[in-house]
């Protein structure tokens, strides 16, 4: 490994994540050179490449394996997903993240003409026998832990799509209306999906109320509607009213 590679890795590991522009300035080289260096280091497994930068592979990940999450609060998640099915209409383009609640949405979806964009292998499998549902897979780097695809290839596709609405979950919402995720790769992809969508719907069970995690995903004001199994705490309900966010129980 040459000196510049060591310098890049040291900076990314110290900061947890870094943008291409930030690294170019730190190393005093061009953005194009940094991109090539990051791709090389990512191919060696020394860091994780994201759109516009990189994330340290030493960064703590608070997320759980999909098969574990799938069985936590399963009744509540199924109830929430069933309610959210009212969003569906023919020929809609729908974004689904790799959360277990989104999997219930995919599993329960009727076989109507529509398009689903997802990075989740479990969503793909849930939709495979629904002949009227066209599935677009983001591609990217596969995570065995999350059984989903992430990284710049996934995010690049999302930037080129127009999605009517996205359905996703998170690790928690704090009392100030911040949405939290367990790791940067999940957070980064969900941000891109939200940006590509006309409307964003958050499916979250009540165990995640007033909880934080590792990475701040977005502000709750970016959400159009929250689907949950119980009423929101008073402070969050007040926040939703102030920002015209609907809640569906």
Swiss-Prot record:
UniProt keywords, alphabetically: Activator, Carbohydrate metabolism, DNA-binding, Fucose metabolism, Transcription, Transcription regulation
Record organism: Haemophilus influenzae (strain ATCC 51907 / DSM 11121 / KW20 / Rd)
Q: Spell out the protein name for this chain.
A: L-fucose operon activator
For this protein, the record's InterPro entries field holds: Carb_Metab_HTH_regulators (IPR050313), DeoR-like_C (IPR014036), DeoR_HTH (IPR001034), NagB/RpiA_transferase-like (IPR037171), Tscrpt_reg_HTH_DeoR_CS (IPR018356), WH-like_DNA-bd_sf (IPR036388), WH_DNA-bd_sf (IPR036390)
One MF term in the entry's GO annotations: ligand-modulated transcription factor activity
Q: Report the superkingdom from the record.
A: Bacteria
**Annotated function:** Transcriptional activator of the fuc operon.
Entry's Gene Ontology BP terms: fucose metabolic process; regulation of DNA-templated transcription
Occurrences of domain HTH deoR-type (ranges): 1-56
Instruction: Fetch the PANTHER family from UniProt.
Output: AGA OPERON TRANSCRIPTIONAL REPRESSOR-RELATED (PTHR30363:SF44), HTH-TYPE TRANSCRIPTIONAL REGULATOR SRLR-RELATED (PTHR30363)
Query: Among its keywords, does the record have Transcription regulation?
Result: yes
Residues the UniProt record assigns to the DNA-binding region sit at 18-37
User: Known SMART domains for this protein?
Assistant: DeoRC, HTH_DEOR
